[in-house]
Amino acid sequence: MAVATTAVEGVPSRGAPGEVIHLNVGGKRFSTSRQTLTWIPDSFFSSLLSGRISTLKDETGAIFIDRDPTVFAPILNFLRTKELDPRGVHGSSLLHEAQFYGLTPLVRRLQVREELDRSSCGNVLFNGYLPPPVFPVKRRNRHSLVGPQQIGGRPAPVRRSNTMPPNLGNAGLLGRMLDERAPPSPSGQPEEPGMVRLVCGHHNWIAVAYTHFLVCYRLKEASGWQLAFSSPRLDWPIERLALAARVLGGAPGEHDKMVAAATGSEILLWALQAQGGGSEIGVFHLGVPVEALFFVGNQLIATSHTGRIGVWNAVTKHWQVQEVQPITSYDAAGSFLLLGCSNGSIYYVDVQKFPLRMKDNDLLVSELYRDPAEDGVTALSVYLTPKTSDSGNWIEIAYGTSSGVVRVIVQHPETVGSGPQLFQTFSVHRSPVTKIMLSEKHLISVCADNNHVRTWSVTRFRGMISTQPGSTPLASFKILALESVDGLGGCSAGNDIGPYGERDDQQVFIQKVVPNASQLFVRLSSTGQRVCSVRSVDGSPTTAFTVLECEGSRRLGSRPRRYLLTGQANGSLAMWDLTTAMDGLGQTPAGGLTEEELMDQLEQCELSPLASSRGSFPSPSPRTSLTSLHSASSNTSLYGPRGSPSPPQAEARRRGAGSFVDRCQELARGAPELRWPPTPAPRPSTSLGNPLTALKKTLNETSF
């Protein structure tokens, strides 16, 4: 039984250095000497044994410390030997305990150890960083001014927003936005105005949505990413974002670069200019909350689970809304739009024919296929095989149902009239299928059981899926991603795990385990193998992410690049080179020092704050200003009484030992000292605690 005692009743404040001290740390007993525990001044143990901290003793008289004994063992070993042996204890746990006990030398050594894997410049995959933009000011009136709303001399097809001002660009201050708390979103959750909510990319453009406005960046080969558009401030949080940066085969003069944002049932659409800037096209109403917003070519599509679909056609400038069955999934390929519904039907829309076949406000939505069990179609993926003849593509559709069944249906171009035929069925999930992807080489399905993933290898003959030998099971794994219950950690639409990537290439999942995580894991969608992990360079939580397939340079031999875009809670945006990560998959990195090797090197010196030893001298860099080195090999200074090198060093320098580069670097390290204002140089001390100082030597052309 532990008994509390005062400093008088407990361990005496003064005792012999060789006195044996018995400790009970978390139920495990340790015995050591007073000298071992108190050689570091102002530590937890020196305060404990001097009576400044009241003690708690167990039934045997041992001092009880309610800490982890497993972590305490390497700490006690360090106090005994001044050498660090982690003994399997994680570095962060060891650092936390060392800070608790106030063991400054050990804390500094562990902090240097952590610097091996941390850098404000990221790792080799870090490709760029965009700071938070200037936020638009809050408007004081709700009436917009008349702007350039005429398109080709005709009035705009829809009303202008009376709740939006003209494009303010970069007007306003960041502080004004952050000082004003945002109103609650339609979901009732609080909003953080400064964090990135959504990120999307298309070709060489990026759209980033904050709570009440969005910005667009354009990649230029010579100057990198440049801010191209900033929207006015909106009254409600942005919940959906879509970007179309290039429309193939578009008619001259039509909008080929557009960005759209949805909030509630309203959709706002802007046209972007290649040279920068943009203009509002209009505001469209779906009538029900928008749950999916995307472009198919130059057609803007909005859907809701209620069964309502809205389409804005860039040619006719017409907004059309139509009711179908409750929509539970969708996918698009080419000009085909497929809608999966709760009644088991898959509806087909050819958006390319909208201007030609629009009749009586009918979008010509036709039923393509109905599930044999009439289960709800909860996930859809369509794959168009390369054209092998003039007849067209072989259409392959994979879909998942609410009962966990995965089916593959195919339609040959020559049998379009007969409809798709059921090709394969997999009953491997016991929860509803939430995602599915049919690519050139793999079939991937994800169910609602903590993102359980099943994958198959797809066999093809002349580009078409084949039954010989058929699809074979490949992998089973989970992409665990916890969601926040209080709305923090970002918008759920901005934290989609994927899979990301072109269907004829390797695809990846992006895993964010906890809502406020600053680290993301990139994994192959086919096997679950880790490709890489990235951590925010500024330590802020990651609130949104996506993968961008970016066009290659015009230079000879260049190829498209794949980037991971991460939006942070502080409003910044970071970019990571996934192409390099994929190229290096499976290669063992040839790194520098290991943690064990670094600890061995640090045992030869002591670490102390540089500011305390250099006075008011400026530090060369934030990183190197943390610590300075002290000799620990002997009790005498490396420099003699007059500041001259020790005999071995003087002899080596007299003989010109070392390479030319080594001598240049040595002199360069001492050169900055010569530029400081002349001050009386203190006499070097022979104590252990003084840092090494550079030689005060006059340089001339023969110094090398």
Curated annotation (Swiss-Prot):
The modification Phosphothreonine is found at T163, T693. A motif (PXXXPR) lies at residues 618-623, 678-683. GO terms for biological process: positive regulation of epidermal growth factor receptor signaling pathway; protein homooligomerization. Residues 19-88 form the BTB domain. Its main location: other. Belongs to the KCTD3 family. Inhibits CBL-SH3KBP1 complex mediated down-regulation of EGFR signaling by sequestration of SH3KBP1. Binds to SH3KBP1 and prevents its interaction with CBL and inhibits translocation of SH3KBP1 to EGFR containing vesicles upon EGF stimulation. This is SH3KBP1-binding protein 1. It comes from Mus musculus.
